[in-house]
Amino acid sequence: TVAGAHGKTTTSSLLSHILVHAGTGELADPSYAIGGTIQAPGGAVLDGGHAGRGDVLVAEADESDGSFCKYRPSIAVITNALADHLDHYGDEAHYCAAFVDHAGHASGHVVMTGDDEGAVAVLRDLDPSVARRTIVYATKDADQIGDLRGATLVRIDAEHESADSGRETFTVHVPASLASVCGCGDADLALPVSLAIPGMHNARNATAAILAAMLLGVTPEAAAQAASTFLGASRRFQMRGEENGVTVVDDYAHHPTEISALLDAARRRYPRSVIRVLFQPHLFSRTRTFAHEFAEALSKADDVIVTGIFPARELQRDFPDVSAMTIVDAAQDVPHASAQGDGTWISAVDDMQVAAQMLAMRCRPTDVVFTVGAGDITAMGAVILHALGARHN
């Protein structure tokens, strides 16, 4: 299983991709159940569900309602455990406890990040026997993480990141003890990885997938090579098109941490571009709880329009004081170096169509526009591209 507040779909897609392209024998043709579709060469899109002939099932484990605690995985991957879905869990302590419960059901190894405070809190609460069969991957050193409780540390060397190549490159350092467990010899391994998808958050996702594949029996080199051919999960930094020098990208990010990681990746991929964001909040409860965090994350962009909230399972009447302006108001206390000429960098426009047209009118060649959110904001990429084309015809 692959669980976590963020990165589940990308990591489970990556693991499935690695097994499809590098798995042999019983690992070949895995089954997978993923909460999204997978981008394939030539613009093709693969369905997120597949019943394969192999012996492995890769399952994205959604934590939103606690149902992932019913799973009994052989390997449990936890990409992070930053608090979310507090409408269900009530508080961070119960949210963390659910991940501890999920990890405890793994019959084999647990693979989790050490770069996330929530995941580290989970590690500290694991049963000692579970902690000892946990693999922690991180850009941090052991002393920065704290007591590993017998877990094995796999370091990600981020010094080899490259913005100029258009790929995210890094090295995964696998200690000899883990290499031996995976049947890969008794020496330390240094695996160079080059991803087509940007951002250090994706370097972590890829590392988790590579480690899980190694534990299943894929050779380290083959796993790393397969990861390098992965084009991404749909709606994860997905290119929608380019019109008159303006690039439009779509992303599913709907939590402050995801948005922050997305915009960090955007700055790496487009270091000299103006970054504009059309953001649709998802859930009134999440907007209310994380309004300031949303504002801080969005401040990494140059220009932001927040649209009306996508309600999903909630009703506006239950949250009469929550709207797009909740985030805009919270942003008034957030410093911003790239404010527009009138001194503002963020505004609220409830109507998505109007907001998309407004953002398109502001664009200049080399700008990059992101449509961001878990709702129907994804449809606005085409609207923006059409508006850009019409403006220059």
Regions found by a protein language model. Name each.
Residues 5, 35, 113-114, 139, ...:
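Cofactor-binding loop segments of dinucleotide-utilizing enzymes, especially the Rossmann-like FAD-
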Residues 37, 64, 83, 117, ...:
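Residue-level marker for beta-strand->alpha-helix junctions and adjacent short loops that shape enzyme
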Residues 162-189:
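Acidic-glycine-rich active-site phosphate/pyrophosphate-binding loop
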Residues 26, 100, 128-133, 179-184, ...:
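ATP-dependent carboxylate-amine ligase
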Residues 40-42, 116-122, 142-146, 285-286, ...:
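Short, charged/polar "capping" segments at the starts of alpha-helices
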